[in-house]
Amino acid sequence: MGTCTGHADLVELKDGRWYMVFLGIRNDEEGTSNMGRETHLVPVAWEPSTVRWEEVSKGNWQPVEYLWPVASPETGKVERYTSLPFPENPQYFNDAFTDNFDAEELGHEWNFRRVPLPGTYSLSAFKGFLRLHLKPETFKLLGRYSLMGIRQKESDFDYSAKMHFEPNKENEEAGISIFQQDDNYVNFTVVKKGKGVNLKLTVKEREKELEVLKEEIIDKYQGEIIFKLSAKNNTYQYLYSLDGGNTFRLFAETQSNIVLCKGYIGTYVGIYATSNGKPTKEYADFDWVSYKGYPRY
């Protein structure tokens, strides 16, 4: 199930067994996956192979054999799961993450695209919340903007975020994002439009123009919303709740390959805020984010 494999290291255990650790991409969708290049493990067997023939005496030719490492000798391919070398140590799948923003500093799970702009976020302005300040900057090549995320770890997952946001000026916008590159992302956001507030789904596919896939007024919006992105069977569902998570409404649906990795870099899910080119002092407060991955078997 692995593609783009390479950069292998061979390891011999104390009992004489051999394994190979290398980079590769899961073959989850269209020969690739949204997680990019990851670390894989396979068993190795050493098998003899004739590399040349030598004439040891006149007319007497003998094969010269070397031992070569054969990766995954039983099946000849990278399997989705390989038993760990040490059966007494069960494999731990770290496929869940929740941040209630109660700590004084962000955990190491969080990443930014490049060094964040000064004053991008605060964990102290509103205790128990992450305050993400709206910046005029938006997604652009080699740009810096109010965007932060955690790694997507499985092709099937649920990602949710609870946001408090009361925009005052036209086009002030905040919400969640799933992003692969500066030119390949999906934003699911609340945005100020006229006297009302809209819910908007924006899609930027690679080598295509930016598209507002859906936008509509939220009649009962009271400044609080829970976004949910549910990924199952190569499909993304974009849902939201206005009643604290008691009920969710399906807003839109897309195929997951709109942010499909075509290189070695994986996808992030995260939060995003922008004033779309206008200076502002507004912000969005995030109460929590939650991610749960579901391994494929």
PLM features: what roles do these ranges have?
Residues M1-Y297:
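Carbohydrate-active catalytic/glycan-binding domains of CAZyme proteins
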